[in-house]
């Protein structure tokens, strides 16, 4: 049997540690579920900012007036024949334009153009006034531009068609200062129709263009020898027969 030896008594017995109780933890605060505050109702756009004033243009014939019912009262508006009448009523601006100022063409003054074919109409828009340019101004402007362009093209063509006097006797190329290698009798004349694109014309042009420049060290290349149609090309060697291919096995899965 196994026996255990009793512990020997000592002067200083080992202290006996007793488990200490943990200190009470601070009480946790309860989180109260707070509902989000209700957002304030959005103010209506009409209350936030006043609406922009609206502008209307009315064209009146000579001797006519505009009648507007306002709070049970009929308001009669008649502009002078030589001026524009502007009236503001409850955030609405009305421009009364006489018929005489509708087609104003004075320099520095805008001309009012009516939209309706009758010549008198009203149009609502955010602009303070409506300005329109007549079609005659645009037509005249574009016509002058086209005439200037055509004159410039004619001058350019006349300059090339009639060379200066110092160049009329000699032959010059398109590059200024470089004489042309073509003599007067070699210069090809203008041709029309199929002659311009015929092979003979192209061949003569190539020969003339290959002429050497005077004083140039470069020499033209010799012409390529013409191939005789009677010459036969050497027969091609017979192709070697191909080796037979090996049979391939294919697996078919059902």
From Swiss-Prot:
A Pfam family matched in the record: DUF2476
Biased composition, class Pro residues, residue ranges: 214-241
Coiled-coil ranges from the UniProt annotation: none
Spans annotated as Disordered: 1-50, 161-196, 212-254
Basic residues bias locations: 243-254
Name of the protein: Proline-rich protein 23A3
InterPro entries: PRR23
Entry's family note: Belongs to the PRR23 family.
């Amino acid at each position: 049997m196994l026996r255990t030896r009793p512990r020997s008594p000592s002067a200083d017995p080992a202290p006996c540690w007793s488990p200490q109780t943990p200190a009470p933890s601070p009480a946790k605060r309860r989180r109260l579920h707070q509902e989000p505050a209700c957002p304030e109702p959005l103010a209506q756009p009409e209350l936030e900012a006043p609406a922009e004033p609206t502008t209307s243009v009315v064209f009146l014939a000579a001797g006519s007036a505009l009648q507007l019912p306002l709070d049970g009262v009929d308001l009669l508006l008649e502009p002078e024949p030589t001026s524009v009448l502007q009236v503001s009523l409850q955030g609405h601006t009305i421009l009364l334009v006489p018929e005489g100022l509708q087609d104003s063409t004075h320099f520095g003054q805008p001309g009012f153009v009516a939209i309706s074919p009758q010549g008198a109409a009203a149009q609502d828009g955010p602009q303070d006034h409506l300005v329109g340019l007549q079609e005659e101004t645009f037509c005249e402007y574009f016509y002058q531009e086209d005439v200037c362009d055509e004159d410039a093209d004619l001058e350019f063509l006349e300059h090339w068609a009639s060379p200066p006097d110092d160049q009329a006797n000699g032959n010059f190329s398109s590059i200024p200062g470089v004489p042309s290698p073509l003599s007067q009798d070699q210069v090809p004349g203008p041709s029309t129709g199929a002659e311009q694109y015929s092979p003979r014309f192209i061949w003569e042009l190539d020969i003339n263009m290959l002429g050497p420049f005077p004083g140039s060290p470069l020499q033209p290349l010799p012409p390529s020898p013409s191939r005789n149609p009677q010459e036969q090309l050497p027969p091609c060697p017979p192709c070697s027969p191909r080796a037979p291919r090996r049979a391939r096995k294919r697996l078919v899965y059902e």
